């Protein structure tokens, strides 16, 4: 969507309001009784928050399962303002909206394994997005935006800027010369921004087969 995902959210909110709905933000909900009476509720929260808010309205067994959910790793993310597009050596990457930076398969496996072991990898697997490739309106004329993140052990507050930029530079020499501004967020920043992102976990829990089937 032109303008980014916020444009999609704005369109959905606009449609809801046309149908008579209301949207309220910036309000902490501690218990389900604080919400308007309804026949059903949809939660987009952590499982522990859902268990706390719904309280006795949930069966004890189910509530205990919600509170037992294992949270996954966190992330360290950098948002960039760039003077030029990312100078990827691979021409296909210059046209892609998303680029996963990992080097060899062995490197990727090692990076993710180390993260699960509580180690900050020297060569992290980095996920990047370059929105202005397809939507120039996301930045001032002639400029670009770019973001990149890597997985880190849950709750990590280590600054991973150098490791991430070193990885991008491997495949896009001169990248650092394009950086005008950067903003970083670690696990603590994410949880402060949204308490549902426990330990910086942005996917809502470990996605292994045991948890997916229980």
Predicted segment positions?
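Generic, well-ordered alpha-helical scaffold segments in large soluble proteins
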Residues: 11, 15-19, 44, 53, ...
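Mid-domain catalytic core of redox enzymes
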Residues: 21, 25-139
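Surface-exposed helix-capping loop/turn segments at secondary-structure junctions
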Residues: 17-23, 88, 158, 169-181
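Helical element adjacent to the flavin cofactor pocket in flavoenzyme catalytic cores
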Residues: 1-30
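Hydrophobic side chains in beta-strands
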Residues: 80-82, 101, 130, 150, ...
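Conserved FAD/dinucleotide-binding core of flavoprotein oxidoreductases
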Residues: 48-52, 81, 140-167
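A glycine-rich dinucleotide-binding beta-alpha-beta segment and adjacent secondary-structure elements
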Residues: 1, 122-127, 174-214
